[in-house]
Amino acid sequence: MPKVPVYNMEGAQVGEIELKDEIFGAPVNKAVLYEVSLMYLANQRRGTHDTKTRGEVSGGGRKPWRQKGTGRARHGSIRSPLWRKGGIVFGPHPRDYSYSVPKKVRRAALKSALSDKVNENNLIVVDSLTFAAPKTKEMIRVLNNLKVNGKTLIVTAGYDEIVEKSARNIPGVSVMTAPSLNALSLLNHDKLIMTRDAVLKVEEVF
């Protein structure tokens, strides 16, 4: 079982925690990470793109000139795809891009991402994150104490409004609950900060 140090909010080590091998010590499967990340990104797409066909472009109801006798090519509408401002052939139309992969695969990707954070020493466990009131300045102080910079994901056991509000104005810092943790969020951040309770919650849920 991998062991990682546990820090307090002042950045001092106050102990160690043993992590479950099957979650934090799993082999890193890049193929699964790619497949699941692609799914999450596809599911975020709105799919509202649209183009007008020749039947949807305004105008073009009248034949531009008579069929024969002018010496010009024959045309039936000024909204033909051949014309400037004409309709679009086989253009994009609104569609749903979302799809799903099996839960077992999603969990394998999450375990791979968590294990990668441990392998790269990018997982920081804190005994707790408690603030008297929402203060961005206090959260910045804690991050500085932990020597954390760059894109950082903070994971709490459950929803914590004070932690959420304290971190939301810091660029590159996000807050999630342990049950909603996913592989894409982990891959999108360089550092992972988890409370001790969040680690236990992840081991319980996943």
UniProtKB/Swiss-Prot annotation:
The keyword rRNA-binding applies. Keywords: Ribonucleoprotein, Ribosomal protein, RNA-binding, rRNA-binding. Gene3D superfamilies: 3.40.1370.10. Residues 63-77 have a biased composition (Basic residues). One of its GO terms (molecular function) is structural constituent of ribosome. GO terms for biological process: translation. Coiled coil: none annotated. It comes from the Bacteria. One of its GO terms (cellular component) is ribonucleoprotein complex. InterPro entries: Ribosomal_uL4, Ribosomal_uL4-like, Ribosomal_uL4_dom_sf. Residues 47-77 are annotated as: Disordered. Part of the 50S ribosomal subunit. Belongs to the universal ribosomal protein uL4 family. One of the primary rRNA binding proteins, this protein initially binds near the 5'-end of the 23S rRNA. It is important during the early stages of 50S assembly. It makes multiple contacts with different domains of the 23S rRNA in the assembled 50S subunit and ribosome. Forms part of the polypeptide exit tunnel. This is Large ribosomal subunit protein uL4. It comes from Carboxydothermus hydrogenoformans (strain ATCC BAA-161 / DSM 6008 / Z-2901).
